[in-house]
Amino acid sequence: MGKEEKELTPMLAQYHQFKSMYPDCLLLFRLGDFYELFYEDAVVGSKELGLVLTSRPAGKGRERIPMCGVPYHSANNYIAKLVNKGYKVAICEQVEDPSKAKGIVKRDVIRVITPGTFFERETGGLCSLYRKGKSYLVSYLNLSVGEFIGAKVKEEELIDFLSKFNIREVLVKKGEKLPEKLEKVLKLHITELEEEFFEEGKEELLKDYGVPSIKAFGFQDEDLSLSLGAVYRYAKATQKSFTPLIPKPKPYVDEGYVKLDLKAVKGLEITESIEGRKDLSLFKVVDRTLTGMGRRRLRFRLLNPFRSIERIRKVQEAVEELINKREVLNEIRKTLEGMSDLERLVSRISSNMASPRELIHLKNSLRKAEELRKILSLLDSEIFKEIEGSLLNLNKVADLIDKTLVDDPPLHVKEGGLIKPGVNAYLDELRFIRENAEKLLKEYEKKLKKETGIQSLKIGYNKVMGYYIEVTKANVKYVPEHFRRRQTLSNAERYTTEELQRLEEKILSAQTRINELEYELYRELREEVVKELDKVGNNATLIGEVDYIQSLAWLALEKGWVKPEVHEGYELIIEEGKHPVIEEFTKNYVPNDTKLTEEEFIHVITGPNMAGKSSYIRQVGVLTLLAHTGSFLPVKSARIPLVDAIFTRIGSGDVLALGVSTFMNEMLDVSNILNNATKRSLIILDEVGRGTSTYDGIAISKAIVKYISEKIGAKTLLATHYLELTELERKVKGVKNYHMEVEETDEGIRFLYILKEGRAKGSFGIDVAKLAGLPEEVVREAKKILKELEGEKGKQEVLPFLEETYKKSVDEEKLNFYEEIIKEIEEIDIGNTTPVKALLILAELKERIKSFIKR
């Protein structure tokens, strides 16, 4: 210990020792009933948690140091706030009883909590990325629910893949350059680790699971063990003895799911609305689950819809059976309503963090699981038969908990009052002593009087001597030899016996020993329960599936939804379809039909803003998605084809912070769609081309439609305000025009929200502006200008560098720039340039011209 540390108080010297070991963490240092933060940590804690910043002496000749603290019993609330802000928190705990400590209390860092490892709250999980060529080896571990998966993902698909999981922290090799968008789009906390950490993690993973290779878990790429090992080792290194049960890793196989990239998830507003509101999301509106397991299963299924007719129909069959057997559905819901989140209980119990009450919750939930198994025996659907056969009877675990713990135990495990009478004979004896101390002493006193014949003998107590036997001087001659003298008084002698000392020890230490013994018995119970947690986890997964299916059934009953026919053909036909989210919050919702066929597979939908174009095309996407989850739909009838992907381009989801213009964002999205869509895909395009000039937008939109028609053949819905696109119906195969109907009145227009064949009569932009409340003067002026523009027939907008007259008027710098652009255009090899590449070239040229003109 250096001179500087010697000058510190012993407690602060101990603090410095641990802080030096965890310099990148906020160190919560246990002092009595508080966790304290010191120095810079205190300043951060005060700012982030709104705590009062105080100070304390640091040692002889030293200035006072900043400090602030939080009560230990509510520390998790404060830790959650820090972790959500991206901080790591090290917990430095007292590891011995302060009352028994000789000198300063022993402390140790028992756990490090990071954004991806705070499993007390369902805040998210931990991910590891390990680059291999043009792909990433990805692992995801969610400690709160025991989910551990791995996959090999192409670099261009990485963001879409990660967006399916609730990831808070990413582990990477030190110096690893991640895709630029990753942190900004997904808002992740990055933790860099040395290369050796990945190698050592791999060895630790294989050793702990007792396998020579991760191929034993079903993985094909051996290098994935580096990524899996990193998250595994990181979790164990940070959580130490509190590490929850980590299941064996499983391969993530996406071949069985409809592809939904991040744009589709945002565009269809699956987990949150475009404005970021979760209460307006599809998930929130359709959720009728009753357990945490079911809720997570529903969310996962919405993000990973089935791409298998067989799996969809099995779910539909189960949903339909529950609808037809309403009493059974009610019984299932009644059973699930009181069930705890078993996946989270497994995590907490295995990490030694579960309270006695949580074990009671486990007992009650296991009893309910057995009730559920009996209810499922009343059903005939294949899924329910499979689940019934796979649900394990864990009454033995429930019985053990029931036999050991009282029905309403205290919240904290060391408070006593946990264990039922009859579990442990010594505990029963201690409790009897505690509750009958005075009676026991009187009985012993009576026994001694009888043995000695000294009727004046009495047992007394003081703080100095403890319990004693007092005999008057006149009766000393009758005292037995086994009495040991303790004290002489003027008129009496005080004695003790071995039996009295044993009784005294039991009485005085009874409560302490009761608490210690109850804690030991609780730990033994927990260890027995931990042995069965794999089986509990198995049941949790199955119960989540039941909850997911009953949620679909209850929703269909509640809303009057109809079973769609999901088929392997091409046509998509919806009769009187509704958007489930918009219908939820709208009175007198107007349903619409959809008919996409091999002959008419591209629908160009025109109409003014606010007429319902965007809502309608999203509606088709949402209904298609729901059908692939096995859900019934808000329709009169529907034939939904199996799709391999749903693509959307809806501009409101642009991430402008990336420094890319709206137009470039749009072109990148369209490029992704045109490069990856197949004939089995569903494409939803909303106002493509609005990020550039009118004629550029029209040209690009026409080229996109033509490419989809000729090269892809995917079912496509294109909402646009460009009426010029409607001429494609005559020129391009598969195009059909539709519009959102508007009624014109003397007061203006009225939106009918009805989809009809044909093109819109006009854009009605000025009418919409009037409805929006623009001043009458502005509306009149706009109408006047519109008439003037409409009168200038034959005039067309052209780019300046194509006009000979303009060339003559520009200065030399501009002329050189335009000639350079023209030269580049002339050098384009049209024969070897795909439409997608042409769009990107056009977008780049447009950006350069815009930048030059602004100069």
Swiss-Prot record:
Domain of life of the organism encoding this protein: Bacteria
Residues reported in the UniProt entry to bind ATP: 607-614
Gene Ontology cellular-component terms listed: cytosol
GO BP annotation list: mismatch repair
Keyword terms of this UniProt record: ATP-binding, DNA damage, DNA repair, DNA-binding, Nucleotide-binding
S-S bonds: none
InterPro entries in the cross-refs: DNA_mismatch_repair_MutS (IPR005748), DNA_mismatch_repair_MutS-lik_N (IPR007695), DNA_mismatch_repair_MutS/MSH (IPR017261), DNA_mismatch_repair_MutS_C (IPR000432), DNA_mismatch_repair_MutS_clamp (IPR007861), DNA_mismatch_repair_MutS_core (IPR007696), DNA_mismatch_repair_MutS_N (IPR016151), DNA_mismatch_repair_MutS_sf (IPR036187)
UniProt GO MF annotations: ATP binding; ATP-dependent DNA damage sensor activity; damaged DNA binding; mismatched DNA binding
CDD domains xrefs: ABC_MutS1
Keyword Magnesium tagged: no
Family: Belongs to the DNA mismatch repair MutS family.
Function per UniProt: This protein is involved in the repair of mismatches in DNA. It is possible that it carries out the mismatch recognition step. This protein has a weak ATPase activity.
PANTHER family xrefs: DNA MISMATCH REPAIR PROTEIN MSH1, MITOCHONDRIAL, DNA MISMATCH REPAIR PROTEIN MUTS FAMILY MEMBER
Protein name: DNA mismatch repair protein MutS
Organism: Aquifex pyrophilus
Organism placement in taxonomy: Bacteria, Pseudomonadati, Aquificota, Aquificia, Aquificales
Gene name as annotated: mutS
